[in-house]
Amino acid sequence: MLGAFGQADILINNAGITQPLKLMEIGRGQYDAVLDVSLRGTLLLSQAFIPHMRDRKSGSIACASSVSAQRGGGIFGGPHYSAAKAGILGLAKAMARELGPDGIRVNCVTPGLIGTDITGGKLTEAMKTEISAGIPLGRIGTAGDVAGAFLFLASDLSAYITGAVIDVNGGMLIH
């Protein structure tokens, strides 16, 4: 990446997988798969970019977590998904504290239910209506809603923000 573009100003850790399993259905392989992609992936990719950002004394790392981490479950993810996404919150806050003196900001975005190719085929119109009724803004989020939060974190508008969590859930979870 650096060879092609010369520098990295922002890293967005946005990998994740989910499995709709109950607690007692989760096997080691399933647990490892979800945590490896979400949590270990966030750590390893960050470690790959941090030396470059430290050399430049500048950078922004934005990590995708989930409302599932904050409320202890979601519509599609199992407990291991919630745990992985909660781990990202803790990791990002620890990274913000450690990397701040190096001029590197680290923040999280916690999307709620977002209409994507993953969720699109799993929700009937009746389900969408029922879920939307419980969201104060009255709709399921879009990829653009989430992208806006990441764009903000990539910009100078967030130059004095680190260790923060931006909820993008239409009010699905208010705390």
Can you name each region flagged by the protein language model?
Residues S46, A84, A92:
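Active-site helix of classical SDR
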Residues K22-L23, Q30-L35, I131:
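Substrate-binding pocket helix/loop in short-chain dehydrogenase/reductase
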Residues P51, K93, R97-P101, A159:
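Alpha-helical segment proximal to the catalytic Tyr-Lys
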Residues S66:
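Residue(s) in the substrate-gating loop at a strand-loop-helix junction
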Residues M1-G6:
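Conserved amphipathic alpha-helix within the SDR
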Residues I135-V146, L157:
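A conserved structural motif in NAD(P)-dependent oxidoreductases
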Residues F150-L151, T162-H175:
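Short C-terminal tail/terminal secondary-structure segment
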